[in-house]
């Protein structure tokens, strides 16, 4: 008989000397401030930030959505620790002016907090 166990998820920890953003629900690290591209985005629940890279985030399947800036293929992203949906990842932009978003991540402000080194 084989005993089934839940796979252990290992969290990434960002350097404590940098300003960072964490999940508001469980405090898992999400991104360094240095990876912030823009604060001028709109999520489904309000303001959102665009990041170049994130950690401790899982990705759902991509789907086409008509967003404020046109049609994009996006995948919902979620905190790997508490499984809260945080925003989405831009998989593909169909308009040339939006190509810079490909591979980037949107995290809604309602799901993250500033952590460490903010004065």
UniProtKB/Swiss-Prot annotation:
Coiled coil residues, start to end: none
Source organism, top-level taxon: Eukaryota
Residue ranges annotated for the Yippee domain, each copy included: 19-116
GO molecular function: metal ion binding
Transmembrane portions of the chain: none
Compartments where found: Nucleus, Nucleolus
Keyword Nucleus tagged: yes
GO CC list: nucleolus
Residues binding Zn(2+), per UniProt: 23, 26, 79, 82
Keywords per UniProt: Apoptosis, Metal-binding, Nucleus, Zinc
Keyword Nucleus: yes
Biological processes annotated in GO: apoptotic process; brain development; filopodium assembly; Schwann cell development; spinal cord oligodendrocyte cell differentiation
Major location category of this protein: nucleus
Leader peptide range in chain numbering: none
InterPro entries on file: Yippee (IPR034751), Yippee/Mis18/Cereblon (IPR004910), Yippee_fam (IPR039058)
Pfam families: Yippee-Mis18
Function: May be involved in proliferation and apoptosis in myeloid precursor cells.
Assigned protein family: Belongs to the yippee family.
Name of protein: Protein yippee-like 3
Originating organism: Danio rerio
